[in-house]
Amino acid sequence: MAALRASLLLSCALTAARAFNLDAERPAVYSGAEGSYFGFAVDFFAPDASSMFLLVGAPKANTSQSNVVEGGQVLQCNWNSNRNCQPIIFDSTGNRDFAPDDPLEFKSHQWFGASVRSKNDKILACAPLYHWRTETKQEREPVGTCYLFDGSKSVEYAPCRSTTIDADGQGFCQGGFSIDFTKGDRVLLGGPGSFYWQGQLISDRVAEILAKYDSKVYSTKYDDQLATRPASAAFDDSYLGYSVAVGDFSGDGIEDFVSGVPRAARTLGMVSIYNGKNMSSMYNFTGEQMAAYFGYSVATTDINGDDYTDLFIGAPLFMDRGSDGKLQEVGQVSICLQRASGGFQIAKLNGFEIFARFGSAIAPLGDLDQDGFNDIAVAAPYGGEDKRGLVYIYNGRATGLNAVPSRILEGQWAARTMPPSFGYSLKGATDVDKNGYPDLIVGAFGVDTAVLYRARPVIRVNAALEVNPTILNPENKACSLADVKVSCFKVKFCLKADGKGKLPNSLNFQVELLLDKLKQKGAIRRALFLHSKQPSHSKNMTITKGGKMNCEELDAFLRDESEFRDKLTPITIFMEYRLDYKTAVDATGLHPILNQFIPANMSRQAHILLDCGEDNICKPKLEVSVRSDQKKIYIGDDNPLTLIVTAENQGEGAYEAELFVIVPPQADFIGVVRNNEALARLSCAFKTENQTRMVVCDLGNPMKAGTKLLAGLRFSVHQQSEMDTSVKFDLQIRSSNLFDNLSPVAFYQVDLAISAAVEIRGVSSPDHIFLPIANWQPKENPETEDDIGPLVQHIYELRNNGPSAFSKVMMTLQWPYKYKNYTLLYIVQYDIDGPMNCTSDMEINPLKIKISAPKEDEKNETFSREDNRNHRISRRDLTAIEGDVQTLGCGNADCLKIVCQVGHLERGKSAILYLKSRLWTQTFMNKENQNHSYSLQSSASFNVIEFPYKNLSFEDIHNSTVVTTNITWGIQPQPMPVPVWVIILAVLAGLLLLAVLVLVMYRMGFFKRVRPPQEEQEREQLQPHENGEGTSEA
């Protein structure tokens, strides 16, 4: 239901701008005294065939009655330009008394004018809050009273002012709360407070009310009165008579009585229909939701033209669930269509805005647009902008009520001390200006306003548009355009106008013709009018109302085929007409309007003759295939990919044929292969439509039968995600042909693969240590690093050379720290650079040696620098003590193990492990270890555990390396000084070379200064042809 309401609201928004024949732009506005509630009730009044007025109730207006405050008025207003409103005097007396200082009645605040109805020259107006003091008790009772005016006199009609007093009788009747006239010259009065507020309907004949009136009689009994009687206590507080209407529901030609009972059935609400002959019950309609006030308003009219009266019931407090699932008060109108076979077909119409009180008032409008079906108005007096009020106009049709309003009237008055309540009262179905169309009055008592909307005469237009011929042969050039033969055709357009009601005899229309309408603005239109060489033509036409068709004919021509591409799409000839409203206005200033249910435009099509057989319909047979030599793409690499595409047409011509390549998000289009003579050089463009990336290539217009094209398209694939396993390209040929305009979709899929060149390398800094160390003395309990021995760093770098990234690598380091209970390399600390976490199987720096601050370049020593340093010293460069070199590694020494987990590493990135240690010099200074050379070796290995690409497999990737620090007993070689004679000889050679250079430059005039000429004749003359053979080529 919420979805239906939303769709109807959208429809309303669209149709509201399509103003139908109520003149909402120039309404007649009437204003009353501020605070008088002018507009609380409205009606039309026709005292004779030549007169028409508006009736407006103002129940809180002050009158000239003696000692009466806010007695209320009914005002009579002119509908034409003189919008003067004058009160009708129904009662000029003050309160009557039983005796002096013993009042009979209380007319102050009686709300006279709260209900008003008229029929011909008679007006019934009521004061439902009128009080009187009964003859037997001193209590005031709101029995209500009415006055019936017949043009010559006004008589009081107070059927509830009877001897049946108190709440259990008619003492709280509030007679006249709702009223109506029947066609049979009866009045119907609702009194919702009778019988403990069960409510009551009372009907009397107009003639008897007039005849039996006696100002001295307070309680009048009528012989032909029809009235409902009290029911059981279960019906208390039901409010029968809250709203009333009349209509024939028995088929006997006599109008029956309809009444809303909004609090009946435990507040579900009811509407009851009583027989117009004897007040017997005929039908009961029960609401479906508690407290919706079902029956707040009722109305009757034949909405579907089947000659059976239909019933409309308002429930302004009805709640429906919104899009969020919560209940919202939107209001509802029930449409009860009376069937010929008996019973009713019921439909529901929900409101569109919350708290708008949709259905508060319902008014039959008569046949507003003269289409043969009656229409209705439904008010939402607190809807719209700032709750100014809305009135929806619904049109009848053979199937019932059109659920989409044809017009929405909006209140234009801002709130004062209370909401404007525009639409609280409605009255239609009366032609106030005698133009053949019924009009509508809308009351807005919150701003003391009534508004008259007159219906505009509806013009029905019959239009015709013809094109001859409809098949345009570009080769048949029968017309001349500036001595050039062109292919031409004729455009004929006709208009005829008629309508009901008062319309001028001549109607002026502006007709607009447009050739090739479907081409967007700025595009080349393929056809032009011969006389103007333009695609559009305007014409003013005068049409006689009810006359014959008025026609005109124009020549148009087809442009040369070289001027446009689209030869397949039909050429649309479009005609639109508009009424000149200024020349059609009547004497009262009312404009007619075109029938909005008939489009004011039409179109025809012409086709260009194609080489497509006798039927002029081209049916191509399009095929596309694709291949590539590249079968695998490595993630992380900038992979060039060339697709070789074959496009064929084995059928008839394909117009505006294009190759569409859907580009996956992992790829970018580079261009077309142009360095291969075997491949066609297509014209291609990259486009994005609705977030779909595509390459569109032109294949010809037309792509003739038998065409076969071979082309190469270059892409770069480099934006793979972690979940991708392949890259897919979709290809299709599309044309503008009507039939068989698409080829089957071809696709090329290339698989993704992982490749990562991971390497590990290490370096020792320094790589040689020479013993003994000068001035070094061992300490039994070392406290600082220098107390232990010289610094030894091993640096390991794990580098990913790509192209693919990895997400997890395990690296294991083996470190020789003890041999035969002698400490070798004592690790002081280790540090990392990059996404790496490490743990060791033994405590680092267990002696808690104080760690010295690193030098500035100690940690940042690079591998390139380490490789280029002259650490490698051969044995012949050393004066070493002869002896074997003993290797101490994890094969013969105790090793500490460090395990590192390396995280995500992109191509070209590294993770580095810095191991800072001290050579335990005391070990090598022992006598048994002296005069020997040692090679201390640490090792590192890695294994790639995981890649971030979840759906791809990979091969085992691992490697290892060894870092060596050499310990040598001997004398460290010193660099030899350069001899003095070599230095002297080099200086002399440099001076000799400088002298030679100076001599050569002197000989060439380098040191000679060139001065500018002093005399005019010394200046060099400019030669005109010095720099070429003539200035004409410049």
From Swiss-Prot:
Motif (GFFKR motif): 1005-1009
Protein name: Integrin alpha-V
Chain positions covered by the region annotation Disordered: 1013-1034
Stretches assigned to the Cytoplasmic side: 1003-1034
Listed InterPro entries: FG-GAP, Int_alpha_beta-p, Integrin_alpha, Integrin_alpha_C_CS, Integrin_alpha_Ig-like_1, Integrin_alpha_Ig-like_2, Integrin_alpha_Ig-like_3, Integrin_alpha_N
Subcellular location: Membrane; Cell junction, Focal adhesion
Function per UniProt: The alpha-V (ITGAV) integrins are receptors for vitronectin, cytotactin, fibronectin, fibrinogen, laminin, matrix metalloproteinase-2, osteopontin, osteomodulin, prothrombin, thrombospondin, TGFB1 and vWF. They recognize the sequence R-G-D in a wide array of ligands. Alpha-V integrins may play a role in embryo implantation, angiogenesis and wound healing. ITGAV:ITGB3 binds to fractalkine (CX3CL1) and may act as its coreceptor in CX3CR1-dependent fractalkine signaling. ITGAV:ITGB3 binds to NRG1 (via EGF domain) and this binding is essential for NRG1-ERBB signaling.
Organism annotation: Gallus gallus
Molecular function as annotated in GO: integrin binding; metal ion binding
Binding site for Ca(2+) 2: D302, N304, D306, Y308, D310
Source organism phylogeny: Eukaryota, Metazoa, Chordata, Craniata, Vertebrata
Assembly notes: Heterodimer of an alpha and a beta subunit. The alpha subunit is composed of a heavy and a light chain linked by a disulfide bond. Alpha-V (ITGAV) associates with either beta-1 (ITGB1), beta-3 (ITGB3), beta-5 (ITGB5), beta-6 (ITGB6) or beta-8 (ITGB8). Interacts with RAB25. Interacts with CIB1. Integrins ITGAV:ITGB3 and ITGAV:ITGB5 interact with FBLN5 (via N-terminus). ITGAV:ITGB3 and ITGAV:ITGB5 interact with CCN3. ITGAV:ITGB3 interacts with ADGRA2. ITGAV:ITGB3 interacts with FGF2; it is likely that FGF2 can simultaneously bind ITGAV:ITGB3 and FGF receptors.
Disulfide bonds: C77-C85, C126-C146, C160-C173, C479-C488, C494-C551, C612-C618, C684-C697, C838-C900, C890-C895
